[in-house]
């Protein structure tokens, strides 16, 4: 896992329900916590693009529902600025289910993936069909 060059705003709080865009069987997940988040006492953990989260599967196949898994945020609606000055924003918030080492569990990712997430997790970059 590498560092991200641009400063990503952490726009997704714990409790946010997000679409899962891979073919693992999960459709909607809820963020429980964000890995390596360091905040103040009683502050809700927040995540942005490229952050690994602990999620609970809310909608999906019966085998996937009610499971606690790891996921990486690959898209967010809140815009962020890249070092070259371009501002990037996506139409939706999306995650990809991964294992504890950051390797995706699915074999296909629907829609675009942010370049920052693909650089931090190279296996997500190779699985993605489109990197923006």
From Swiss-Prot:
InterPro entries: Ribosomal_uL14, Ribosomal_uL14_arc, Ribosomal_uL14_CS, Ribosomal_uL14_sf. SUPFAM superfamilies: Ribosomal protein L14. SMART domains: Ribosomal_L14 (SM01374). CDD domains: Ribosomal_uL14 (cd00337). Keywords: Ribonucleoprotein, Ribosomal protein, RNA-binding, rRNA-binding. Gene3D superfamilies: Ribosomal protein L14. This is Large ribosomal subunit protein uL14. It comes from Methanococcoides burtonii (strain DSM 6242 / NBRC 107633 / OCM 468 / ACE-M). The gene is rpl14.
